[in-house]
């Protein structure tokens, strides 16, 4: 583990390797550019495939267990914890041909042809549920098979590979992404170090995914899950919503209270969960096969950076994260008021408004909710956008159908408000760890699309690229393209994808039907082309703004990889 808080031009001896520790901040501390370049080059970084690809070109598909292997699963002789046996038993992935965009005209029944002069209004990266894991934390719940992920220790690597892949797409395009939005569940255990790793993946720098003491289960740099590695960052403005994993113990096992905060910084397995059938468990960081420890008498080296963050601390950390934009949507007034919802104009100077909601309920459940104060605020934001004839994108961690029945404001009331605001075109969500599309409409012709994006923590480990295209004939086309991380075959992120596909075969997740057999249906909600009839006043207002890009990146870049 790198010495925390030390950024200099000196050499730190870590026992296994000499590192010159100079991340991006070193340029601000008086280090020369050559010193910085030398420092960063001394930290391994993980490469991508030779050629970029999206799910238009090829998709990773999980292997279905054979009848013999399924019998072993059923009788308990092959369990989800025996991940070293996954490949031997045929679990993993294979590549298949990509899937085209599936066109939907439900919100544009009279749409005939694309415009002859098209404008790209927004080029967006959507990320969901990275759930970065500190696998050595004593408050992990890996004794519960639904919580356990055989590649959990590789979540920093997967998220960085996802960002690295997106960065290559952005750099290959004629313009960078206008912005990125993470739709919640930034961390898995709500810990400070997990959030720090996620932020570094987005901003660039050195990620040291080790905690406790300096572990090096496989001697040498860049070859095991605890080795530091270099993140290149997205180089686009990014925003974030909160999810249940950011405000509850492992997403739903109790509040973040003083007992949990003390236990997280301790050295013994936490056994204080109120859930009688849920068992603690964490990964021993000195084991090459990342073995899970279930014995509460075994010591895991303590680490103060494992502190589970309060909502105020979480918002302050995001505000102070650096990178663009300043505050990432949050203000100091928001933080003081514990207000985790906001609105922004993510495409500078253009009439596109993004409203980011806080659908979490830190006191009750992992499901979604909304209070009366936020609902009133949302109503005012929508009225303001209508008055200014703006396009509106709504973001929340939970879909409307994932709200719980004790929410102060019901999902139906939120839906009714959004669906009667005719300039709302999209509701972007996460939480369910799969791709879904839901048409929210009043009469079958007016409404918006609710899109849930799959997680980067679980198979298929994808993000989404969205592009809003004005056809200049009264219609908007929304291109939705899924992108799996393009990790080179020998990288740890590539290994994580194999492990995630293996877990999928066991069906041990929180989501009904989340098995290999479900995959055939999952693909149908991946690449989409959504046609939307624009309100006349919004369409006219868009024409008042000049210098929209005329290159449609989805056509000219993504489809040509």
Model-derived features: where do they sit?
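N-terminal secretory signal peptides that target proteins for export/translocation
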Residues: 1-14
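C-terminal motif of bacterial Sec signal peptides marking the signal peptidase cleavage site
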Residues: 28-30
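Bacterial signal peptide processing site
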Residues: 32-34
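Metal-dependent phosphoesterase/phosphodiesterase active-site architecture
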Residues: 37-118, 122-137, 141-171, 178-179, ...
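Active-site neighborhood of phospho(di)ester-bond hydrolases with catalytic His/Asp-centered motifs
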Residues: 126-128, 178-185, 234, 239-244, ...
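Active-site-proximal segments of metal-dependent phosphoesterases and phosphodiesterases across multiple
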Residues: 152, 361-376, 380-429
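Core catalytic region of metal-dependent phosphoesterases/phosphodiesterases
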Residues: 154-266, 271
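Active-site environment of divalent metal-dependent phosphoester hydrolases
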Residues: 188-190, 245-251, 363-364, 399-404, ...
């Amino acid at each position: 583990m790198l010495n925390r808080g030390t950024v200099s031009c000196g050499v730190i001896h870590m026992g296994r390797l000499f590192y010159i520790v100079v991340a991006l901040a070193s340029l601000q501390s008086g280090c020369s550019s050559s010193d910085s370049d030398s420092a960063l080059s001394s930290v391994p970084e993980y490469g991508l495939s030779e050629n970029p690809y999206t799910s238009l070109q090829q998709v990773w598909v999980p292997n279905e267990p054979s009848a013999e292997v399924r019998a072993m699963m059923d009788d308990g002789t092959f369990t989800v914890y025996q991940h070293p046996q996954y490949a031997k038993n045929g679990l993993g992935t294979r590549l298949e041909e990509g899937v085209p965009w599936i066109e939907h005209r439900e919100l544009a029944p009279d749409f005939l042809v694309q415009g002859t002069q098209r404008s790209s209004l927004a080029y967006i990266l959507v990320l969901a549920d990275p759930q970065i894991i500190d696998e050595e934390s004593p408050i992990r719940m890996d004794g519960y098979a639904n919580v356990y992920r055989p590649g959990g220790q590789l979540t920093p690597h997967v998220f960085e590979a996802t960002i690295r892949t997106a960065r290559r797409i952005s750099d290959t395009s004629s313009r960078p992404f206008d912005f990125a939005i993470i739709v919640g569940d930034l961390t898995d255990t709500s810990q400070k170090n997990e959030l720090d790793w996620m932020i570094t993946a987005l901003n660039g720098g050195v990620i040291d995914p080790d905690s406790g003491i300096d572990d090096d289960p496989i001697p040498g740099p860049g070859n095991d899950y605890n080795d530091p590695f270099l993140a290149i960052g997205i180089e686009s403005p990014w925003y974030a919503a909160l999810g249940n994993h950011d405000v509850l113990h492992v997403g739903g096992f109790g509040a973040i209270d003083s007992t949990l905060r003390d236990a997280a910084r301790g050295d013994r397995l936490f056994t204080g969960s109120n859930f009688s059938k849920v068992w603690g468990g964490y990964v021993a960081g000195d084991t090459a096969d990342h073995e899970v420890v279930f014995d509460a008498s075994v010591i895991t080296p303590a680490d103060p950076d494992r502190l589970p963050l309060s909502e105020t601390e979480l918002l302050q950390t995001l505000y102070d994260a650096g990178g663009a934009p300043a505050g990432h949507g949050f203000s100091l007034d928001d933080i003081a008021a514990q207000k985790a919802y906001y609105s922004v104009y993510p495409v500078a100077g253009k009439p596109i408004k993004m409203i980011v909601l806080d659908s979490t309920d830190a006191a009750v459940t992992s499901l979604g909710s909304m209070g009366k104060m936020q609902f009133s605020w949302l109503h005012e934001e929508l009225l303001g956008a209508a008055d200014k004839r703006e396009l509106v994108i709504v973001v929340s961690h939970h879909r409307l159908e994932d709200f719980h029945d004790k929410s102060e404001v019901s999902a139906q009331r939120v839906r009714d408000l959004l669906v009667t605001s005719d300039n709302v075109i999209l509701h972007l969500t996460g939480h369910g760890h799969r791709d879904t599309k839901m048409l929210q409409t009043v009469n079958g012709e007016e409404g918006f699309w609710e899109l849930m994006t799959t997680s980067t923590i679980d198979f298929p480990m994808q993000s989404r690229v969205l592009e809003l295209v004005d056809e200049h004939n009264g219609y908007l086309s929304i291109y939705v393209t899924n992108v799996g991380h393009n990790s080179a075959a020998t990288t740890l992120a590539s290994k994580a994808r194999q492990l995630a596909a293996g877990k999928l075969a066991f069906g041990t997740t929180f989501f009904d039907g989340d098995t290999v057999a479900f995959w055939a249906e999952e693909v149908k909600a991946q690449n989409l082309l959504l046609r939307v009839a624009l309100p006349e006043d919004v369409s006219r207002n868009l024409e008042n703004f000049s210098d929209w890009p005329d290159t449609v990146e989805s056509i000219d870049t993504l489809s040509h990889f």
